Amino acid sequence: MKLTKSRLEPMIDASIGNKPAPMLEEFRGFVKQTSGYGFAVTLAEPYYVKTAAEILHPLGKKVCTVLSYPLAGMTHETKMLQARTAIADGADELDISMDLSLFLSGRYEEAKEDMKGFVHLTQEHNVLMKMIYFASRLSADDQKRAAQMAVELGIPFLKTNPGFGAVTTPGQIRFIKQHYAGMIQVMASGGVRIAEDAMAMVEA
């Protein structure tokens, strides 16, 4: 499978990468730079969603933000407020961390119920939702359990990891596809920095 620029760009959510706390002018410059490419979306921290939308929406480009980041250790009400604010500010997509503490404590139904409110909210506002499920922190059984939860909730995308502080492997992508192909899409996040990394994920 030949990797071309036009084929690869729509698969990428552009992020500022290893600079998680950019200054305003740095972020503006990053957004303007991404606007010249065919990326699926440009990622913005919640504070910068409105800034990104002001630049990108007139160009027909989309904005994504991450919520309850990185480990979802907030109350459900706080996370829902954050989601509503992001949508009002112009977010077209929301990457939402499942509550890792609940999940690893075996409180799966509570973790599922926590995600359910986001599913309803994003469907109501026609906003794409991706669930961050922390593949690098989970056993194989727990990866399947998280994927099953997302499928049952009707979440369209799984995102392997937070983009900062974790590395996704092609094996993690293959694992989800092996068990849930056709039921949910999976996006690699974390450690995908060069074309060779991206190609390995596409081939997985």
Where in this protein do the model-derived segments appear?
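Glycine-rich, proline-tolerant flexible connector loops at the mouths of alpha/beta enzymes
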Residues: 31-51, 69, 94-113, 160-168
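Hydrophobic, well-structured mid-protein blocks that either form specific transmembrane helices
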Residues: 81-83, 87-134
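Conserved, mostly hydrophobic/aromatic
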Residues: 13, 52, 86, 131, ...
